[in-house]
């Protein structure tokens, strides 16, 4: 249930939009399986497979972006095209031109697509209307771009903004490595990546290794900066922070797992409990993370404008 990756975006806090309205916006873009000749397709799917495109509890919403893609290796297409081209050349007595080869390749692709394997992938989106977060559970930037693209297409004038904090995450992570500790209930774990900003970009990675202060100081004095840092929040959630503020490898720790509702009687009740627990914990963690990075610049601008 827990998101593994957090691509963060800001919404107005609070964002006064009801789940029913989101449902209406998403409905025209609901996922429809592709036909036999479509290479890929995408749309919104039901988080609970009950037909509803929005799952909502306590001003928290879950959406599911579904993408379907046919697997047709280029090597297979090229192999069949080459064989077909040889047959045609034997019949007509001369080699095919570039345009004819391109048209033949397109024809072969159309013939093979209906027999290609299909893969389907779901990507979850969490909307916190109370605190103004929109979070995409995607590790790859390209996948996040696809989800954002459909969100913007589905929701007219979506008030989506990037997260802007006062402190550079790279500078902050580098300082925390140098001091060996992070502020505000966060701790530094044993995975880190330091990279030189100079030509060549020399990189040092630590995985499951004690981050000794002398070693960190030596690398930082040599011009390297921290670009990935494993951390833990409040002994409850571990994660890896990146320069873009994308959070990866999110893992709830035992204290949270033990907080799961033992009275849940069925899948629906367990799902509701899990969503409430996850969104509550991650919401508090994100608030604390923004605080230790100097605060949200959007909030500062809004307060200045109001004054």
Curated annotation (Swiss-Prot):
<dbReference type="GO" id="GO:0000018">
    <property type="term" value="P:regulation of DNA recombination"/>
</dbReference>
<dbReference type="Pfam" id="PF04381">
    <property type="entry name" value="RdgC"/>
</dbReference>
<keyword id="KW-0233">DNA recombination</keyword>
<keyword id="KW-0963">Cytoplasm</keyword>
<dbReference type="InterPro" id="IPR007476">
    <property type="entry name" value="RdgC"/>
</dbReference>
<comment type="similarity">
    <text>Belongs to the RdgC family.</text>
</comment>
<comment type="function">
    <text>May be involved in recombination.</text>
</comment>
<protein>
    <recommendedName>
        <fullName>Recombination-associated protein RdgC</fullName>
    </recommendedName>
</protein>
<dbReference type="GO" id="GO:0003690">
    <property type="term" value="F:double-stranded DNA binding"/>
</dbReference>
<dbReference type="GO" id="GO:0043590">
    <property type="term" value="C:bacterial nucleoid"/>
</dbReference>
<dbReference type="GO" id="GO:0006310">
    <property type="term" value="P:DNA recombination"/>
</dbReference>
<dbReference type="GO" id="GO:0005737">
    <property type="term" value="C:cytoplasm"/>
</dbReference>
């Amino acid at each position: 249930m827990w998101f593994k990756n957090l691509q963060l975006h800001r919404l107005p806090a609070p964002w006064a939009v009801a789940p029913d309205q989101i449902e209406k916006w998403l409905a025209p873009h609901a996922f429809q399986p592709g036909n036999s000749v479509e290479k890929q397709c995408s749309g919104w799917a039901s988080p609970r497979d009950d037909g509803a495109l929005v799952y909502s509890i306590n001003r928290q919403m879950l959406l599911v972006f579904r993408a379907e893609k046919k697997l047709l290796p280029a090597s297979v297409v090229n192999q069949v095209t080459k064989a077909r081209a040889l047959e045609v050349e034997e019949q007509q007595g001369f080699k095919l031109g570039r345009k004819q080869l391109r048209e033949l390749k397109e024809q072969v692709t159309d013939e093979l697509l209906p027999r290609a394997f299909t893969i389907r992938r779901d990507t979850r989106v969490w909307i916190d209307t109370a605190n103004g977060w929109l979070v995409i559970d995607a590790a790859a930037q390209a996948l996040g771009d696809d989800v954002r693209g459909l969100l913007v297409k589905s929701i007219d004038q979506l008030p989506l903004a990037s997260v802007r904090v006062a402190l550079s995450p790279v500078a902050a992570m580098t300082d925390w490595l140098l001091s060996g500790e992070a502020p505000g209930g966060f701790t530094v774990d044993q995975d880190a990546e330091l990279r030189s900003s100079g030509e060549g970009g020399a990189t040092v990675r630590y995985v499951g290794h004690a981050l000794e202060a002398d070693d960190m100081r030596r690398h930082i004095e040599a011009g390297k900066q921290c670009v990935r840092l494993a951390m833990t929040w409040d002994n409850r959630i571990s994660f890896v922070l990146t320069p873009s503020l994308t959070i990866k490898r999110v893992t709830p720790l035992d204290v949270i797992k033990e907080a799961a509702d033992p009275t849940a009687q069925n899948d629906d009740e367990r799902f509701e409990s899990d969503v409430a627990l996850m969104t509550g914990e991650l919401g508090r963690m994100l608030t604390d993370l923004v605080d230790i990075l100097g605060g949200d610049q959007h909030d500062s601008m809004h307060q200045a404008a109001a004054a």
